[in-house]
């Protein structure tokens, strides 16, 4: 039996569920959640995601929190191990210091042994340099590698 992949859902993915300005990406994102509902994947977010969502306009907060509840996304907590690993990503120049939350997303997924980070952030996360650097750092520190993909690369249909 094939192991169900464990996905870390980044804040950008939750925002794209409601992104009327990019209907193609919105539909791909909704398809991903359909596959999550069908239990093709285990799906997780973190308290960092919740904190980022809380900075959105009130209506968007309600929509996203409702979506999180509807799809039963498990919330992982940032801990000292994840903070330390995130700092290593920043020290290595993989993530700019002003984007600590992005480093935390990767670190939380890594320390919780998830398989894939699903994210729409092409600016500095879904990039070859970042993927290679993160996995090099992870291996050097005794963690397993992690995949970083957009929803378009994850959906099966």
Region spans (language model):
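Short, well-structured N-terminal submotif of metal-dependent ribonuclease cores
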Residues: 1-45, 54-66, 91-97, 131-134, ...
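A structural signal for short, well-ordered beta-strand segments and their strand-loop junctions
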Residues: 8-9, 44-46, 117-119, 150
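An acidic/histidine-cluster motif and surrounding catalytic segment
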Residues: 66-67, 140
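Active-site neighborhoods of divalent-metal-dependent phosphate/nucleic-acid chemistry enzymes
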Residues: 74-132, 155
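Short, C-terminally biased terminal segments at protein or domain edges
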Residues: 142-157
């Amino acid at each position: 039996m094939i192991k169900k992949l464990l996905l870390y859902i980044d804040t950008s993915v939750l925002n794209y569920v409601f992104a009327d300005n990019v209907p193609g990406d919105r539909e791909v994102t909704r398809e991903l959640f359909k596959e999550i509902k069908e239990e093709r994947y285990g799906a997780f977010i973190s308290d960092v995601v919740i904190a980022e969502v809380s900075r959105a306009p009130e209506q968007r907060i309600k929509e996203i929190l409702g979506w999180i509840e509807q799809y039963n996304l498990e919330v992982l907590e940032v801990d000292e191990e994840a903070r330390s690993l995130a700092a290593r990503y920043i020290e290595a120049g993989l993530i700019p210091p002003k984007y600590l939350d992005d480093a935390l997303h990767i670190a939380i997924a890594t320390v919780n042994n998830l398989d894939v980070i699903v994210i729409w952030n092409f600016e500095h996360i879904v990039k070859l340099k970042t993927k290679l650097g993160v996995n090099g750092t992870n291996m050097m520190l005794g963690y397993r590698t992690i995949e970083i993909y957009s929803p378009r690369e994850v959906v099966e249909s």
